[in-house]
Amino acid sequence: MIPGEIQVADGDLLLNEGRATLQVAVANTGDRPIQIGSHYHFFETNPALQFDRAATRGFRLDIPAGTAVRFEPGQTRTVTLVAYAGRRHVYGFRGDVMGPLDEIAQSDQGAQHEQGAQA
């Protein structure tokens, strides 16, 4: 082995295998580009992005870690989302969930966020 060399197994690596996925059409209604990172809770993205927010609770973009998707002003594109795994607790982001995804009904903040996004 050479120092710094990376040896990988033959074949393809299957990412997010067996997890629920969702395709959603997303429109940027704002006047600025919006970029969403690979692990951002999609439900809590910028309110200028219009899509079925309720359906995306507990999902993130199904893209490689460390990458992002950019939505230009006026652009509509379909993205694939994948369900969070593990404990499924979400903290931070826009502060709309702040806890376990499976035990908490949509919070008042989340409902307000959703209403603001639809206005």
UniProtKB/Swiss-Prot annotation:
Record's subcellular location = Cytoplasm
Record-linked Pfam families:
Urease_beta
- The reply to whether Cytoplasm figures as a keyword in the UniProt entry is yes
| Listed GO biological process terms | urea catabolic process
Q: What NCBIfam families does this protein's entry cite?
A: PRK13203.1, urease_beta
HAMAP family noted in UniProt: Urease_beta
Q: Kindly provide the name given to this protein in its UniProt entry.
A: Urease subunit beta
Organism of this sequence:
Tolumonas auensis (strain DSM 9187 / NBRC 110442 / TA 4)
